[in-house]
């Protein structure tokens, strides 16, 4: 695979203090983001924590907390006015102190909910006891922490535990040294081997996912060959023989992205199913790695969508919706937002593959409301995807004006993500204008879309044929337009089995759109009829 596709730029590290000095707006100020992310109970806990643990002079940060909390947008000038006697330099120090105190409060509040926090707390206690010279007490806590770490497969944590055990044993003989030394050496080697394999597989999964986020599906044989080559060169020789949870998780994720990039949707389905089944076989890990479980369910739904497994899609979505209402999700901001985004996306997909576009429109207001509520915490990529799906919902329902509004949000977004989505947003934008009969701008739009897609190396024969048709369609008499559409449909159907030519179908059902023009029926009606004829429809 070309090195440029998998090159990671190292971001210059910036100090904690400098982050506060360069945060002029709502989306950038990290203290503002943190305070706005807090639930009522978390704010209440912080106030109690700070009053118990701080000196009177430190209570000024409570004033700062309240001032920031009341802001709709971060404004430093307004903030300084609300804190009379505070200089700009003092404000930076106060903000840094407040930020740390909020995190300390959250750590206390959330420790029971996080295995990682619990393990680190135990390690801190063991280290304190070691420094006090209470070696046996320290080792006792380390033993308990090791047991918890092994149960929850937290092998990275074991490295620092074993390192402290070795330090205690080497500097302060506490047990049968020879037997203990041999055991610790074996443990250290075992953990090191395990961590190395997990690191290699997680790197592979992350790099493949990064490629997809940047480019989307493989555009041509060159892309496919480079992905296959990269996978072959970086997949550890004995990866398929691994039995550990994390080894299997990252192995399945690697093959998931590998298959998805190549549009091998059957392989994609097999590995997303393995990903989810891994959690089902070890239910404890759903709590430990909730984020990965949620992502697995999302990808399994996508696989059912790509294969039009209507029944399995419906049952998986129902299971995912039930999980989204569990305390584990509802009590965690990140999981609640993740499940909302993925379930919203899945519900739109369900309407798109069944042709019930109009029935899906009532979903949009709530999605918009939640996106506005979560705007500080939803990544740009996810917003692009949701906006595109909403645009397709309006396109399929025949509301081309609103479809264009949503596509403009993508076209005007300059985030360096998903070249493929940018290309197909422009193509659907062009089709929407065609449907509206905006003849005066079609030719210039065709040229613009053609240039953009060619530049991004996203132009296939199908897109070329569609663009060619659109460019000349308004010069064709109404009597001759139907034969021209039938000709175009035949040319595209001929290419239906070529994965690189039909990647457009992952973004818009071009064939159903053309069939609707030829038969003079709605696109919704065409897709609904296909659904009703499917053996895999919901019964």
Question: Where would I find each of the regions flagged by the language model?
Answer:
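Flexible inter-repeat linkers and adjacent short helices
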Residues: 3-5, 9-230, 240-242, 477-539
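Helix-turn-helix repeat elements of alpha-solenoid scaffolds
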Residues: 96-100, 133-143, 174-186, 218-234, ...
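Residue-level signature for tetratricopeptide repeat
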Residues: 128-129, 168, 257-261, 303, ...
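Alpha-solenoid helical repeat architecture
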Residues: 153-160, 195-202, 242-249, 284-295, ...
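Alpha-solenoid helical-repeat scaffolds
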Residues: 197-315
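Active-site/pore-lining binding-face segments in mid-to-C-terminal subdomains
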Residues: 412-481
């Amino acid at each position: 695979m070309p090195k440029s596709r998998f090159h990671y730029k190292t971001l210059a590290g910036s100090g904690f203090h400098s982050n506060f000095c360069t945060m002029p707006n709502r989306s950038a100020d990290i203290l503002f983001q943190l305070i706005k992310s807090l639930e009522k109970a978390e704010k209440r806990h912080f106030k109690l924590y700070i009053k118990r643990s701080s000196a009177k002079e430190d209570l000024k940060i409570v004033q700062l907390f309240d001032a920031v909390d009341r802001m709709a947008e971060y404004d430093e000038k307004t903030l300084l006015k609300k804190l009379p006697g505070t200089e700009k330099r003092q404000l930076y120090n106060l903000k840094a102190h407040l930020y740390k105190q909020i995190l300390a409060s959250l750590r206390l509040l959330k420790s029971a909910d996080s295995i990682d926090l619990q393990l680190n707390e135990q390690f801190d206690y063991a280290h304190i006891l070691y420094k006090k010279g209470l070696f046996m007490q320290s080792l006792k806590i380390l033993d308990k922490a090791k047991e918890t770490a092994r149960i929850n497969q937290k092998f990275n944590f074991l490295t620092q535990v074993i390192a402290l055990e070795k330090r205690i044993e080497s500097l302060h003989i506490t047990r049968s040294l020879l037997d203990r030394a041999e055991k610790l050496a074996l443990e250290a080697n075992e953990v090191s081997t395990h961590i190395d394999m997990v690191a290699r597989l997680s790197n592979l999964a992350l790099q493949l996912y990064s490629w997809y986020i940047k480019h989307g599906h493989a555009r041509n044989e060159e892309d496919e060959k480079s992905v296959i080559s990269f996978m072959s060169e970086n997949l550890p020789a004995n990866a398929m023989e691994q039995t550990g949870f994390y080894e299997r998780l990252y192995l399945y994720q690697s093959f998931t992205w590998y298959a998805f990039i190549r549009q091998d949707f059957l392989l994609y389905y097999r590995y997303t199913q393995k990903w989810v089944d891994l959690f089902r076989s070890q239910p404890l890990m759903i709590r430990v790695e909730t984020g990965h479980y949620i992502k697995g369910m999302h990808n399994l739904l996508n696989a059912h969508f790509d294969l039009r497994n209507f029944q399995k899609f419906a049952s998986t979505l129902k299971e995912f919706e039930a999980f989204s209402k569990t305390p584990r999700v509802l009590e965690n901001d990140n999981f609640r937002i993740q499940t909302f985004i993925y379930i919203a996306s899945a519900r739109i997909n369900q309407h798109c593959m069944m042709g019930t576009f109009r029935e899906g429109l009532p979903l949009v207001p709530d999605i918009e409301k939640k996106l506005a509520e979560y705007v500080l915490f939803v990544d740009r990529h996810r917003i692009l995807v949701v906006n595109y799906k909403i645009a397709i919902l309006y396109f399929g329902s025949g509301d081309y004006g609103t479809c264009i509004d949503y596509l403009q949000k993508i076209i005007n977004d300059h985030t360096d993500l998903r070249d493929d989505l940018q290309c197909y947003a422009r193509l659907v934008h062009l089709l929407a204008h065609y449907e509206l009969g905006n003849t005066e701008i079609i030719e210039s739009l065709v040229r613009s879309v053609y240039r953009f897609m060619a530049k991004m190396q996203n132009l296939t024969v199908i897109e070329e044929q569609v663009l060619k048709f659109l460019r000349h369609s308004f010069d064709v008499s109404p009597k001759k337009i139907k034969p021209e559409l039938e000709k175009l449909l035949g040319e595209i159907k001929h290419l239906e089995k070529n994965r690189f030519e039909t990647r457009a179908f992952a973004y818009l059902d071009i064939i159903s759109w053309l069939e609707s023009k030829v038969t003079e029926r709605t696109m919704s009606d065409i897709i609904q009829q296909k659904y009703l004829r499917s053996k895999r429809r919901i019964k």
